Amino acid sequence: TDDPLSLVAELVDTQEPLGCDKNLPARFLLPLMERGAAARFVLASDAVDDARAHKDEAERAAMRAASATNDAAMGRFRELVHEGITEAEVAGQLEGIYRELGAQGHSFAPIVSFGANAADPHHEPDGTRLAPGDVVLFDVGCRQNEYCADMTRTFVFGKPTPKQREVHDTVRRANEAARALVRPGARFCDIDRAARQVIEDAGYGPYFTHRLGHQIGLDVHEPGDVSATHDAPVEPGMCFSIEPGIYLPGEFGVRIEDLVLVTEDGCEVLNSYPREIDTVG
């Protein structure tokens, strides 16, 4: 139809309230209001957010497929690095690889960080050139069949130092501790605490500077997070990230991120790419 708003107006009961999501553009909402399409308009974002937080079987399959593509892409991304290449040059090649693998492109702007830049969790790729001994952090995600993937792995360009190994192992164990706790009924804040405790016990507590994770689906960051302040219970069908990190200013940073899908009795880890420390180049 040339006027889809008229069709929507015809389908809505003018004697009943109409719930609208917070993201409904004004160019759609205002014409409906002008036509008196409903008795009143109410914000219904909580209901929409709750529905999106609980993935049905088709959505779960889409999340698995997107994450499998992300795993395959990570194996390709690591092959791009060599001495002297810049973060921006690497980042510029990622979307083409995603498209070759069947994805529609990025689910968010990729983070590619070398050396001390990896100590900034939200670093934007720049002209920094890769040098021997640098850590190489990829925080990347693709969009496939409208659903988002998100994963982080941290490598070393050359032989890892003892400190790089220690930090990487601590982050890996924190990731494992959090994943082991994910099941229906577990509280998000307790999952965050499990990862944070591992990092604190290793003496790096002040250097884990962000929440443990976020929910994901049609958008890469959806309402609800895995943090110390979120005491709601985990429920089947929810999908969220587990991404502990240690960030040492002026030195390097390490983050290891996986997506988990909550099942009836535990969780399914959607990423299978190895988490152990590895070298690139």
Show the residue positions of the predicted features.
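Active-site neighborhoods and metal-handling regions in enzymes and metal-associated proteins
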Residues: 1-281
